[in-house]
């Protein structure tokens, strides 16, 4: 793999990184650098605690500009969002209470370009957006 990559690492960006990097990347850990963005402070702490040396975990939301945003912390962490839940739609499904907002926090959002520049990243090979 080193020969194929010419001794460079793949750069993987995970936007909305709750749960961490997808397990299918686990066999290639030594060949990639992961940049994980997770705005939920609860999930960020878990990611930071369990991250490998090849991962940079950033507690930030991404947006089209640098600005303050509202973030809705939901009962189930993985469904927290900058958008309030639409219960007119969600109540049509089982388990809609997982979207109950427990708290609204204010946090700074920034652009992907700005965040990558701060980390010295010029190029990205893969990006997963789950927001």
What are these regions (language model features)?
Residues 1-131:
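Phosphate/nucleotide-binding beta-alpha loop and adjacent structural elements of enzyme active sites
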């Amino acid at each position: 793999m080193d020969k194929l990559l010419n001794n460079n690492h793949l750069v993987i960006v995970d936007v909305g990184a709750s749960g961490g990097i997808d397990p299918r990347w686990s066999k290639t850990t030594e060949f990639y650098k992961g940049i994980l963005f997770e705005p939920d402070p609860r999930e960020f702490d878990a990611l930071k605690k369990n991250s490998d040396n090849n991962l940079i975990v950033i507690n930030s939301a991404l947006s089209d500009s640098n600005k303050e945003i509202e973030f809705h912390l939901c009962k189930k962490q993985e469904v927290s969002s900058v958008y309030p839940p639409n219960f007119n739609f969600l109540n049509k499904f089982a388990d809609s209470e997982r979207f109950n907002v427990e708290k609204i926090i204010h946090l700074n959002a920034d652009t992907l370009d700005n965040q990558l520049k701060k980390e010295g990243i010029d190029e990205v090979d893969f990006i997963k957006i789950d927001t």
